């Protein structure tokens, strides 16, 4: 797999892949106007020329959490495209004014069509974001060009303003395309329901009627009975979905992590093959700025809740509406669509009548919306499950509406449609609620159903264990596109599983999230789990005899545990963060570190003959002997696997125990409350009331005498994104930050 090019990649990836066919031919397809060569003339007020505009074509721009590929159009400007307009042709596009210019004067957007030396205005609209709040987001338009059908037509996108602008991003056109009613083109859809555990759906044997629409869909597709997610919360799971890589490889593991921009996602793979790519996403963990999941998408719509802000309550109806709108704007074009609803996620607030569908019902005294606040007695668990199931039933109804609309538009039969969950939800099966805390089956066993084009394999059920990483190669195979070979990806096309050509393999799942660190390796018959924090233990379950994972049989199966443990450790990717200790100011130090994981890659700088370090306890303990001199500090750095495993520090200086004032943490140089201490992590756990340690990746001032502690990125890695106040508040609303967490001091 090659490294991806500049993040704001242009439409040149698709050059030549989509040809505009005869205007009257029955095989005419839609055309992306951002293709190289279609733009023939550009006049911009900023003085930029055609060559410059072509370098900007396709750069992504975000307005109100909707990211589009764009064209710069500072008024006055004219962008001329030479095209053939097909019969039944439409021009679809977005247009908008970036937030930094919402206090400026209005801008008029105009579409002109020129043919035979005569230019005619086909559409216009004035945007005034200062006076009209509704204009502070992307606007969308669909212009019927049927009367201009034929060859040799010029489409001119023009902007006019009350004042000339030299800012190239003063106004923007987004994703302009010629679309064709009734044209046939390949279509791939991945429809993900956040927080949906497999055993609460009817195709997987649930006793309640939560998913009648999914049950119908199962009859038209294939049910994969043992589909396993690679993580127990959204970001790493969707990262594996988009890249077909394990979480440690794609690097979107913890809350502030960014999907590794050096990787190529499913969107980028398909975009390079001439597909238009769109997404409608309800979870801000995926669409927030800086997460990186929008790479490879022509349009990536983050859906807001009440108050037009990121919210924990974004109902599926709005997501489905946006998904259908995206399909409508790309008619007749090869299309990949990602849909991400999140109704089963806390809080459990299904709309009527689904809020009263299952007993025992919630009430004012027992609201049953969030187990973190509403669980007080055993009966509350049943109420919470009832509301969770109500959310599933509501979301299922919307999925049914989506499928019916695909059929009504004539899109369903030729499409590959993948339905899945990203992770599950727990209700005290192993002593906890919600998700992101372990890798037990209630969290990693997800529904996975695939409707193949032309009804192939309809009605089949597959017992062989598969994984979320298999979705990407399955989509490519269904579209008859090349499938990368391992190790570029870890997944296999599910078509090969159906044909019996792929033997069943184990699946790795891992979690390193807000103080919970664990990983596991699962086969269809057994499972190994290693927990590092807050529990520190090793578990083994016989899934045939104990599918609920209640009986730890590790002692009785030591050889099997050894084999699975070795498999996990071989698959784990090195931690990109390195813990660094700098000792300065003179004195004799003995520092002892221990971890629930294992220490690796120790590097020491400046050590003299009498200074050394030793590793003991099978890699779990590190002892360092240092004698720094004034002006001659010593540094020792090391990695910890898995990422997030706790590290504890204690030690002595000149024979006396270390005191808190001798230890300096990160850029602020704060002192711990006590020694021994648990070394700080990049992000806090539930009960942490302090702000995020944004500066953990910067060292304390070098002149501080004592032990200085901070984190460094391993070579070639980029630091995680600093969290904005808005992003912090949306993550807090979703429950990924504790209720007492303070976002007010962030920008």
Language model regions located:
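Bacterial N-terminal signal peptides
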Residues: 12-22
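Bacterial N-terminal signal peptides that target proteins for export
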Residues: 2-13
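Catalytic domains that recognize anionic headgroups
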Residues: 23-67, 72-747
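Accessible peptide chain termini
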Residues: 1-2, 737
């Amino acid at each position: 797999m090659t490294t991806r090019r500049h993040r704001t990649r242009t439409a040149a990836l698709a050059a030549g892949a989509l040809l505009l066919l005869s205007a009257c031919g029955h095989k005419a397809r839609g055309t992306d106007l951002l293709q190289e060569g279609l733009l023939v003339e550009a006049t911009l007020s900023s003085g930029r020329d055609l060559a410059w505009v072509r370098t900007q074509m396709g750069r992504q721009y975000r307005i109100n959490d909707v990211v589009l590929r764009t064209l710069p159009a500072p008024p006055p400007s004219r962008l001329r495209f030479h095209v053939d307009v097909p019969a039944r042709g439409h021009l679809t596009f977005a247009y908008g004014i970036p937030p930094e210019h919402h206090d400026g004067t209005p801008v008029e957007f105009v579409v002109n069509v020129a043919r035979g030396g005569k230019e005619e205005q086909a559409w216009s609209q004035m945007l005034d974001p200062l006076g009209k709040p509704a204009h502070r987001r992307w606007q969308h338009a669909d212009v019927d060009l049927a009367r201009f059908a034929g060859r040799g037509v010029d489409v001119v996108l023009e902007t006019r303003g009350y004042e000339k602008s030299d800012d190239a991003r003063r106004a923007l056109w987004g994703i302009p395309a010629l679309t064709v009613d009734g044209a046939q083109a390949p279509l791939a859809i991945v429809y993900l329901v956040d927080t949906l555990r497999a055993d609460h759906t009817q195709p997987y044997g649930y006793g309640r009627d939560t998913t009648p629409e999914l049950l119908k869909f199962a009859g038209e597709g294939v049910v994969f009975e043992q589909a396993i997610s690679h993580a127990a919360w959204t970001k790493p799971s969707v990262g594996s979905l988009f890249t077909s890589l394990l979480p440690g490889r794609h690097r979107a593991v913890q809350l502030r992590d960014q999907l590794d921009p050096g990787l190529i996602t499913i969107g980028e793979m398909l975009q390079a093959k001439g597909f238009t790519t769109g997404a409608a996403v309800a979870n801000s963990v995926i669409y927030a700025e800086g997460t990186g999941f929008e790479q490879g998408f022509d349009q990536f719509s983050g859906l807001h809740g009440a108050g037009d802000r990121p919210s924990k309550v974004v109902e599926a109806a709005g997501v489905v509406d946006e998904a259908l709108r995206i399909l409508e704007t790309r008619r007749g074009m090869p299309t990949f669509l990602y849909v991400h609803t999140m109704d089963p996620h806390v809080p459990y607030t299904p709309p009527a009548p689904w809020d009263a569908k299952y007993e025992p019902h919630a009430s004012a005294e027992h609201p049953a919306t969030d187990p973190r606040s509403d669980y007080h007695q055993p009966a509350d668990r049943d109420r919470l499950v009832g509301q969770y199931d109500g959310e599933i039933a509501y979301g299922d109804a919307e999925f049914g509406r989506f499928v019916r609309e695909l059929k009504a538009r004539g899109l369903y039969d030729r499409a590959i449609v993948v339905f899945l969950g990203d992770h599950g939800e727990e209700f005290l099966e192993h002593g906890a609620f919600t998700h992101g805390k372990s890798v037990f089956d209630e969290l990693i066993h997800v529904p996975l159903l695939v409707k193949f084009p032309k009804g192939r394999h309809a009605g089949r059920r597959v017992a062989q264990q598969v994984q979320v990483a298999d979705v990407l190669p399955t989509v490519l195979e269904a579209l008859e596109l090349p499938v990368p070979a391992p190790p570029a990806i870890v997944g296999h096309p599910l078509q090969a599983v159906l044909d019996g050509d792929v033997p069943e393999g184990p699946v790795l799942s891992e979690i390193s999230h807000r103080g919970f660190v664990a990983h596991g390796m699962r086969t269809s018959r057994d499972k190994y789990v290693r927990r590092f924090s807050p529990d520190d233990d090793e578990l083994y379950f016989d899934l045939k005899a104990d599918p609920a994972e209640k009986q730890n049989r590790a002692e009785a199966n030591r050889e099997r545990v050894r084999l699975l443990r070795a498999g996990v450790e071989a698959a784990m990717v090195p931690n990109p963060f390195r813990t660094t200790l700098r000792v300065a100011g003179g004195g004799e130090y003995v520092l002892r570190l221990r971890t629930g994981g294992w220490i690796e890659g120790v590097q020491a700088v400046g050590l003299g003959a009498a200074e050394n370090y030793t590793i003991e306890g099978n890699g779990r303990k590190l002892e360092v002997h240092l004698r720094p001199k004034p002006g001659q500090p010593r540094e020792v750095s090391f990695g910890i696997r898995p990422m997030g495993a706790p590290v504890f520090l204690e030690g002595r200086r000149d024979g006396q125990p270390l005191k808190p004032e001798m230890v300096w943490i990160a850029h602020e140089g704060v002192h711990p409350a006590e020694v021994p201490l648990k070394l700080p992590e990049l992000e806090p756990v539930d009960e942490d009331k302090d702000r995020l340690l944004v500066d953990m990746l910067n060292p304390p001032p070098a002149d501080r005498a004592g032990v200085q502690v901070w984190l460094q990125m391993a070579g070639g890695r980029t630091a995680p994104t600093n969290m904005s106040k808005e992003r912090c508040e949306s993550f807090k609303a979703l429950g990924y930050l504790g209720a007492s967490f303070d976002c007010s001091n962030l920008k």
